[in-house]
Amino acid sequence: MWFQLKIEHCPNDKIEEITEELEECGALSITLTDKNDNPVLEPEPGTTPLWPEVIIHALFAQAEEAQYAREQLVAKRPSLHCSLELLADKNWERAWMDDFRPQRFGNRLWVCPTWLPPPEPDAVNLILDPGLAFGTGTHATTSLCLTWLEQADLKNKSIIDYGCGSGILSLAAIKLGAKHVYAVDIDNQALQATQSNAHANHITESQLSISFPEALQNPVHLVIANILLAPLISLKERFHQLLPSGAHLVTSGILEEQAPLLIDAYDSAFTHIATEYCEGWSLLVFTSK
């Protein structure tokens, strides 16, 4: 059993403070969601992305911890609305599994959960068990990246997947012919998820290196980065160091209206050659100057 504390009417300038207090009370995980299902916006580099009204969900293993956290928060901030819900392990897992079905990207790539057989056994099948924290291909930016990889010539290419999450892009690239992929992320849980998914797909160390970004040294043929605008801009010089002239950089994770900002920011180091859009999100392709 798990105990979920739902916190509403949170002032945006108090969210960080509230999440720190929840961690001190023993929260195992904390999730921020938008009450009105608006996209997270980052209009200027370096700004903090926040929705107009945020809901905080905190997961606890013990009812006493969750109740204590609620009492502490309400005592300090009477305007907060806190509700406690009991979550059954089986129901939580079942709901997640029901939402994840096999998906096709392009003509030949399928992403399939571990608990279902691939619809086309002879296609390029990526078996994925992402857990609750990382991507499964359902988000538009991941879909854009997978579709681009599916149509690209990756044979014998070395690739960096910057911000690998579940490893979905890394593993897809290898399945599609890449010689070696460097999967990097600043989150250790992402690296563990990537390692687990690599094992499920029989990917070897000769094909995939998993590490923090600081370990990157060798130039590659392609960098793909599905992350937010601010880190994309801040990583411009780093990407340029890793890509020889003419090599490709593929970026996603940004809204359509943010695309011109990234193109302008990269102009001194990269040439913009293509753009794809999906559900209000964009994928940009550059070559290194």
From Swiss-Prot:
Query: Please, one GO biological process term?
Result: methylation
Q: Specify whether S-adenosyl-L-methionine is a keyword of the entry.
A: yes
Q: Which EC class, in a word? A: transferase
Q: Which domain of life is it from?
A: Bacteria
A GO molecular function annotation here is:
protein-lysine N-methyltransferase activity
Under Pfam families, the record lists: PrmA
Q: Where in the cell is it found?
A: Cytoplasm
Q: Which InterPro entries does the entry mention?
A: Ribosomal_L11_MeTrfase_PrmA (IPR050078), Ribosomal_PrmA_MeTrfase (IPR004498), SAM-dependent_MTases_sf (IPR029063)
Is Iron among the key words of this record?
no
Q: Name the chemical reaction catalysed here.
A: L-lysyl-[protein] + 3 S-adenosyl-L-methionine = N(6),N(6),N(6)-trimethyl-L-lysyl-[protein] + 3 S-adenosyl-L-homocysteine + 3 H(+)
In short, the EC number is: 2.1.1.-
UniProt keyword annotations, A-Z: Cytoplasm, Methyltransferase, S-adenosyl-L-methionine, Transferase
Provide the function of this protein: Methylates ribosomal protein L11.
Protein name stated in the entry: Ribosomal protein L11 methyltransferase
Q: What is the lineage of its organism?
A: Bacteria, Pseudomonadati, Pseudomonadota, Gammaproteobacteria, Legionellales
